[in-house]
């Protein structure tokens, strides 16, 4: 028996060689063949490939692959070492005894460094609790390090047991005594002893394995793995099927074969033998594997070179195989698109570009099928939602992008992405460890299983979000829940207080000024929402109960029971597999812990444990199902496909970021053959290049999707572009690198030859329509409307409509059209307010003022705000409440001094002439005076409604003495502004003028912004130049917004419109003596009668 080494540039050649080997049957017809594969995707592909050569019918191509057991190398190693069912030295199992050893050793002098890290000497309880929460994660990390030492440098652990520390750095001197204590605690043979015994046993006699074994597709093996395989080959035929990109490089490195694999990596000179730049920069793993393989081999054969196509990709592969660039005589054809690199604006555009490229390839080659294409991305969880949205919606998308008719299969996704119950479990742990913010609970309520449990519909969730925002819920279930943050005396902004407000709002209104304990009823909780309020309260109460159970220190089984109970209390699902998977994953965690799961764990420990359990893992069923396969870089990187697509090769993402573990002894002086994930990712790229038989497509983020700032490609991708420049006689980078525009409807995407090939790049009919529209005749920007709308019928006018219009005349125009303007969305806040900005102060002050005008005592009004939770907590909130209360109190006192008794409502019905009337109600009126008051600084928008009401009353009862008083804050701090108006000489004429402006304002946006027009009219009245004050009110500056910033004005005249848009000539009938601009004429008609009627208070 012996070791047989078979090499080839592509795995399909290796598969054919393996098929030829397996076609020679073993003496025992019932004996199974054993094939060890590196990944699940390779297993699926290899079984399909072998089924075409190992069938039982004529030609052996009947698609049957039987009698072959596919396993991964680790399961074989576990079997021959006797640890298939229970390996006490696996990182998952080792973490538990290591945790116990750490807990028992914290007072040992050698353990002081580790004890300090875990809070054993912390001076405060908070710091100690924080650091103790690291115990499991630290134990699991150290267990992983010890397992890595045992697999990659076993002599290190053997020396530590013998007391030989070698050249161990002083800051890591605590690891040898920790290892010795761990070996004593575990009680089983240490890994290096077990390894030596296994090798001796394998050399003494055959293992209980088939006489013939094959190891297929590996590019890296640890030194212990190589030693086991070498020993196994003594009594078994062991065939190693090794994909290697270059036989020339293999022969050049022949002198390194069988050399000591523990050579320091910095002393390794094998890269000098790599004459091709990609073999030098990407191929370190295969070079180091060649060094590590045993020198004694019965067979060392190269299975022949593949026929390379006469394309850029074929030339690159030929150069790699020949271990040298050979550009002479090569010229890239314009039709050669065998290598494509696409620079895009972010992940979403990468998927847009990918589907256009794939559709182009499928259209150009009718023999190409989706199963011939593989899409690999380093970060599949980022791209998975985008891929789902971009492909495979043909059943529901109708006539849209043809890529929606391509079905895709996603593999290697995290369990939290595929099982919503596990996603809920992860979110529960997050909420339990954090503050239970409003956003967290609302996001949890939107999870499908939670919605099913509590019957939350879309409208229900919108209503709940509104309640949460209006009841000022921020974070924390109740004051007790806030105790760990030192805020247990703050009752405001908790879920408990917010729910009390919602539930009391079912029975009473906020105006009743009746509260339950500290809860002020929340308005707008309608009687038809009583059940929803109850379901929300039940959801929060159950969640509070679950989170309460996910605290403290307890054994692992108690944590998993509490989490399972929480899932049962909060979720409902009809798919039994989801709940079964949860139970299976939890059972797997317990099984790995075994009998050593007794140490008490804290919440961060459990989170670290389950994060690793629920992470992405290789899957078998989603590979090579006939659809378009999307997976990570690992499982399919060496499987030949006609088209290989690499998506997301962004700088900083690929290769994976690797921050050396400061506690890793191997990282201080790495040896050849030891794992380096960045080198591993580089090898993945080299394998993927060799696996593409027809086309290689690569996308990356070449520009920021928000700023457009250029971004470089990943370093390995840049090295590939450099190598491609050396593949032909002239550089080809500019021809194969396509820089895509930001938008999919850019005209470049639909212009033949503008991006790729001679055809339009996009297949999207919507993008084509958009591009055609964008490429149409461009007109200079115009106003919102090109002319006035038809005049509305001369109907009667209600006072309410007139008042609404003059709140903002331009907005009144859009309101008449039922046109919705953009508005700021009120978001849910997660932070307790610690300051009161101007808008919040106005809201609070206006509410206090209204309460005081209704007769509420100022202190009670302040207490109501305290119960609403709108003010900062503690003394800060008390101080701000007093400040706002005092201002509101002074305003209320000033208003009440002029309000005699209860206000009356006066119905009005004024004949405007020409068959039109103005009708409505003016309220409240105190004797012969209207008294309006606002917490705001008195501005034109406040006095104009009072003026309109006064004119209407005077027109209704001209013989009575009427007046209007407006009260507000003055521009000088802490002073009160008062403005008194008396009726004009002809109130009916003023009303007619107001109604004419109202009619005109419904036909077009009038250049009549209130502050700007009032400033113009005041300047005219005072005999001053009106342009400077009006321009100042119109234009926004860095200190305050101007009228040009109002949404209605932006929509009508554009953002930051110049002051001149208001200065056109007056229309016919709008003329006013002395005014040459339309703004001046309209301002005179609106404001001069008001200013002339102003009296002294």
Swiss-Prot record:
Record-linked HAMAP family: RecC (MF_01486)
GO cellular component: exodeoxyribonuclease V complex
PANTHER family: RECBCD ENZYME SUBUNIT RECC
Annotated protein name in UniProt: RecBCD enzyme subunit RecC
GO BP field: double-strand break repair via homologous recombination
Keyword list, A-Z: ATP-binding, DNA damage, DNA repair, DNA-binding, Exonuclease, Helicase, Hydrolase, Nuclease, Nucleotide-binding
Species this protein is from: Mycobacterium tuberculosis (strain CDC 1551 / Oshkosh)
Assembly: Heterotrimer of RecB, RecC and RecD. All subunits contribute to DNA-binding.
Molecular function via GO: ATP binding; DNA binding; DNA helicase activity; exodeoxyribonuclease V activity
Lineage of source species: Bacteria, Bacillati, Actinomycetota, Actinomycetes, Mycobacteriales
InterPro entries xref list: DExx_box_DNA_helicase_dom_sf, P-loop_NTPase, RecC, RecC_C, Restrct_endonuc-II-like
NCBIfam families tied to this protein: recC (TIGR01450)
Chain's gene name: recC
Signal sequence coordinates: none
Keyword Nuclease (UniProt): yes
Role played: A helicase/nuclease that prepares dsDNA breaks (DSB) for recombinational DNA repair. Binds to DSBs and unwinds DNA via a highly rapid and processive ATP-dependent bidirectional helicase activity. Holoenzyme degrades any linearized DNA that is unable to undergo homologous recombination. In the holoenzyme this subunit recognizes the wild-type Chi sequence, and when added to isolated RecB increases its ATP-dependent helicase processivity. Unlike the case in E.coli, suppresses RecA-dependent homologous recombination, is instead required for single-strand annealing pathway repair of DSB.
